[in-house]
Amino acid sequence: MNKDHTLYCSVYIRNAFFSEIGIGISANSCLLLFHTFMFIRGHRPRLTDLPIGFVALIHLVMLLLAAYITEDFFMSSGGWDDITCKLVIFLHRFFRSLSVCATCLLSVFQAIILCPQSSHLAKLKQNSPHQLSYFFIFLSIFYTSISSQILIAAIPTQNITFVNLIYITNSCSFLPLSSSMQHTFSTLLTFRNVFVIGLMGLSTCYMATLLCRHKTRSQRLQNSKLSPKATPEQRALRTILMLMSFFLLMSTFDSIISYSRTIITGKSTALLCPDSCRS
């Protein structure tokens, strides 16, 4: 009975993982194809089209890697060699970091575009794509240095006799790190998450403030009373706040869980896979 219940739970969790990944791959593929099609048709691109397409591409690669890892976690009998194990886990963590970084920079870029000409940020409008590109490259190098420990810690599971391995998939595991190394990487990851999430939150608040000011000025110029129908500014504000609030909430929750799992030693369990693969 317990075996049947465990098998049922495993199948249920596997289907949930693949459904989530499938929805993400479909959505990002459609978004990327849409922007590619618009570019091929010769439509004049907006300033945000290239960053949005780039974010969709990063998410697509990350989700494809996640599908490969999930397949090995639930279905494979363990067939990765040392190079495949290190490369797949490293690339997945790297692209997940780029996903958070690119989404944050997209939020900053949108805030710069919306800023009025009288703002100090208006000077950055023309050069912002280049400056944000340099900043993105810097963060990519920083994330690579943080994730480099995977190239040492990740090993294939076959023919390994270590007791305290942290199992990632059926084919790949993590060697236990020393307490000082764990706290070092946890501190770096926490600093990264606090910085990126904080910057995204500030950008969201700035955009919300600009939209509220624009709505107030429009009503004053038109001498109109509040209409029960939502204005374009209100709809844009609700959309921005809803999306960013959800992203910030999930990122914060994921960071807390990842940090908590990292500082707890001696608990080698397969449930560490989502946080170990995505941190």
Curated annotation (Swiss-Prot):
Source organism of the structure: Mus musculus
Record protein name field: Vomeronasal type-1 receptor A8
Tissues where this protein is expressed: Expressed in a subset of sensory neurons located in the apical layer of the vomeronasal organ.
Database matches in PANTHER family: VOMERONASAL TYPE-1 RECEPTOR
Cysteine-cysteine disulfides: C85-C172
Cytoplasmic side stretches: 41-49, 115-134, 181-187, 260-279
Any one of the GO CC terms: plasma membrane
Keyword terms, alphabetized: Cell membrane, Disulfide bond, G-protein coupled receptor, Glycoprotein, Membrane, Pheromone response, Receptor, Transducer, Transmembrane, Transmembrane helix
Side Extracellular, residues: 1-19, 71-93, 156-159, 209-238
Localization: Cell membrane
Membrane topology, as annotated: Multi-pass membrane protein
Entry's family note: Belongs to the G-protein coupled receptor 1 family.
Listed transmembrane segments: 20-40, 50-70, 94-114, 135-155, 160-180, 188-208, 239-259
GO BP of this protein: response to pheromone; sensory perception of chemical stimulus
GO molecular function: pheromone receptor activity
Top-level taxon: Eukaryota
Pfam families linked to this entry: V1R (PF03402)
InterPro entries attached to this UniProt entry: GPCR_Rhodpsn_7TM (IPR017452), Vmron_rcpt_1 (IPR004072)
Task of the protein: Putative pheromone receptor implicated in the regulation of social and reproductive behavior.
Disruption phenotype: Mice lacking all but one V1ra and V1rb gene (12% of the V1r repertoire) show a lack of chemosensory response to a subset of known pheromonal ligands and changes in maternal aggression as well as male reproductive behavior.
Glycan attachment points: N159
